[in-house]
Structures are given as structure tokens and as C-alpha cells.
């Protein structure tokens, strides 16, 4: 009799909050390539808040601005749930909401290695 292989580690489920369709699609593809599952994707504040409060996911990637609105309410909801998150921004750290400037930040445009590094940083806390 051969021993059974240990069960595969389930892929972490990611919430993607990004208002630009092409960037959102790129993120979803990159996450799949890294072995993650996209649990939900949101393109505007209402979708993002609904997902942040109710969806089942392990980690989130937040665009700093959703159609010109700061993403702070979504970050607040994630903090309330104890869910780690990474910001994605083209503005640099100065564009981050003040209370969240210590969070991992993925600078746009990003590459696969940078995405993986930031997600690992967020997961480890």
C-alpha cells in the first residue's frame, strides 16, 4: 500500500478592489498564476464595501482611489473584520490614507514578483 499524499493547501482567497477594468483583469490573472483564488472583485465603492463586509476571503488588494473616492471606508471595514490588505497605488505612499501608511503598498505599474512579495508581507502581518 502506498501512503496517501497530504491534502493540498487550499489557495488563499483574495478580494480585488480596482476601478480600472484592465488593471483588475491583470491582477486576477496574476493572482491565478501565483496560485491564489479571486474570491470577489469590486469596481466601485458600493461593491467594495459590500464585499469587505460580507464576502468570504483571506486578504484584499485595494486601489487607493475608486473613481475618485478614497478607499478608506473599505480599509476600515477590513480592519474591523481583522482581514489583512495591501494597497495598490500609482501615487506612492503619500497618497495613502493617513492611518494606513504602515500597510504594505504595491506601486503601479507592478510586476508578478512585486505582487507576490507584497501579498506575502501582508499575510505574515
Regions found by a protein language model. Give the residues of each.
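Hydrophobic/aromatic residues positioned on beta-strands within the core alpha/beta folds
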Residues: 86-88
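Two-component/phosphorelay signaling modules centered on CheY-like receiver
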Residues: 21-40
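Non-catalytic signal-transmission and effector/linker regions of two-component phosphorelay proteins
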Residues: 1-13, 111-125
Amino acid at each position: 500500500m502506498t501512503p496517501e499524499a497530504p491534502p493540498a493547501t487550499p489557495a488563499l482567497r483574495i478580494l480585488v478592489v480596482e476601478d480600472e477594468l484592465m488593471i483588475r483583469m491583470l491582477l486576477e490573472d496574476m493572482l491565478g498564476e501565483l496560485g491564489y483564488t479571486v474570491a470577489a472583485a469590486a469596481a466601485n465603492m458600493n461593491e467594495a464595501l459590500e464585499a469587505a463586509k460580507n464576502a468570504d476571503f483571506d486578504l484584499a488588494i485595494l486601489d487607493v482611489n475608486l473613481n475618485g473616492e478614497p478607499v478608506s471606508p473599505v480599509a476600515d471595514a477590513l480592519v474591523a473584520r481583522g482581514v489583512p490588505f495591501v494597497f495598490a497605488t500609482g501615487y506612492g505612499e503619500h497618497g495613502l490614507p493617513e492611518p494606513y501608511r504602515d500597510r504594505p503598498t504595491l506601486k503601479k505599474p507592478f510586476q508578478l514578483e512585486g505582487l507576490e512579495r507584497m501579498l506575502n508581507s501582508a499575510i505574515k502581518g
